[in-house]
Amino acid sequence: MKKGLWVGLLMTIMLPIKAQKAVIEESVTDIVCDGPTHVIAHYKEIVTVLNPQGASLANFACSCSNKDKLTSFKGQVTDANGRIIRKLKESELQKYELSKHLAVDDYTMFLDYTPPVYPVTITYEWTIDSRDDLITFPRFCPQTDYNVSVKKASYRLKAPKSMTILHAQQNIANEVNIDKSSKYTQLLTLEANDLPILEKKTYSHPLREKMPMALFAPADFTYYDTQGSQRSWKDFGLWQYNLIQGLDILPENVRQQLHQLTDTMKTDREKVEALYRHLGKTTRYVAILLGIGGWKPATATSVYKSGFGDCKGLTNYMRAMLKEVGIASNYTLISTTNHRFMKDYTCAGQMNHAILQVPLPKDTLWLECTNPRLPMGYVHEDIAGHDAIEISEQGGRLVRLPIYADSTNLMRSTVNIHLSQDGTANLKVSQETFNRQYENRIPMAKMNEKERQKILPRIVYAPLTEIKSIDFSENGAKITMETEIKSQKYANQTGQRLFVPICPLHHGYTVPNDAAEREEDIWLEMGYLNEDDITLTIPNGYTIEACPKNISIEQPFASFSFSLHRDDKTIHIKNRLLMRSGMFAKSLFPSLAEFLQSINNIYNQRIILKKI
């Protein structure tokens, strides 16, 4: 059963709210496996939706294919008194193909239901019959959203006694019970009852790491006409390596073109970069998760002919092109959502993406083949620091991708402010963003002029602004924004004084107010460094009456400094904020709130200029 097969209520993650929005009254997953290639899974979900915030939990969705068929479905809706409002039939389901472009037969069966009243209870029952692609069993994941409690959830897996079943779990108190008293079958069961709601807290781990979940997989499996093992990453990698053999054949005209492109280049790195650019110019990505459409990539020839592919196909195509010019590379499986694979569980169902590893003499490159717009070898935020499985002739090997140091996720800003006597100001801003902050700036760099002008006020806080120019340039993992603006009321004028903001770049930070209730440790997923260099030219006829004092704050999770230097005509300000990624004790949460409030206080201060 494929990694990408997900069934059940479509639980879209909502914006955080304190009120509970739904109750999972009962969740039943009942699986019968009668051999290495056949599984029947029966599901029952009863959910009470309490208010409109939980409306999306009333929807139904399951992914299917020619090998994973929905064989039965029924549902009903009842009101608070138990009266049946409506029966839901299989004929109401809508079918959505996952891709019209790729040679996959996967599709989604979907029912979009909006409750007429609240509270309302929805019951769904359905069965999936799966054949020939049993790499993992359906997972047990009874709680997949914030502010939803669970009364009763159960998982039952019946399989041949001769089959070795591997399993792993997180955030579930009960252990898997294994009953082998029957002569021919074994029964694995697991329950999770009376689960309180998961609340979204600031500076805490993401939902995926808090959810109760258990994974199950056969140690040895049959996938179509292949056999494989998941007893170790090495074994799993050997199966995946054999699966992709013979898929790297390129047409003769393509081979000649690649040699014309690279034969005169002196280094392998130059060749990799040339082919990476070629990939970006000649192909297009179609978003299909690993496991959906199978584990086998499309052939390099088919990707060349069609001009598009999913992560598997594009990665294999790049691998084939590198092989043609004599450069070895390794197909690599990774998760874009989970940083770590489950401990001692060396099975599929934990990765959803394919990338390419290129080991060079002095460096190892990681190529994101679905987005060649990124600089070659740039490790983006969805994979940086994540576990991955490198696939080679020797089998699979657990590796961990590099992650950029906090201080290299840099935003460096230079601001020149020419202030007039009436409080108007001309501002010239040059802002360089690197690595993770570079990624955050990519969407704006791709916008047209009109769209950029709508976004700029969120970056430069200057009232009544006239944008004179805004330009972007890109060099590797660096985007530079240059803008010139005029603010009609940059400084507030009161009598003989001008009250001037000390920094037009930062509007302040949201200060958490739940420090007293903190139960979780602090988790800062992304560290970064902001450096501001601001020069304010004082208008003629004014002198400095008051300025904020220099300050420096040091905490385990961050550091901040503000310094101001002055002379007769100019004020020079420097801000430096370093946020450190990682886990910090919950006892530091009041200090974090105080730290953020201190920064806000500094940014909200004013320089006071007095008319001479």
Give a label for each model feature.
Residues 1-21:
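Bacterial Sec-dependent N-terminal signal peptides
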Residues 20-612:
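A sensor for short, sequence-defined functional sites
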